[in-house]
Curated annotation (Swiss-Prot):
Family recorded in the similarity comment: Belongs to the universal ribosomal protein uL30 family.
Gene Ontology cellular component list: cytosolic large ribosomal subunit
Source organism of this protein record: Chloroflexus aggregans (strain MD-66 / DSM 9485)
Record's keyword annotation contains Ribosomal protein: yes
Domain of life the protein comes from: Bacteria
Protein name as catalogued: Large ribosomal subunit protein uL30
Entry annotated with the keyword Ribosomal protein: yes
Pfam families referenced in this protein's UniProt entry, alphabetically: Ribosomal_L30
Amino acid sequence: MGKLRVTYVKSAIGYARDQKETLAALGLRRLNQSVLKPDNPSVRGMLFKIQHLVKVEEVEDEVQA
């Protein structure tokens, strides 16, 4: 299973409190900050809720030898 790179690209000022709390739960505090999250239904649901505030990219897991 891959990972998702989530980048905070638009300010949450003026949006509902639950959207701001979702950003905080994902570990996003500052604009243009990126975090890596596992690609699972829980994270996908959070991202769906704030899709207008973030950019999401799929990242493949590194191969460990």
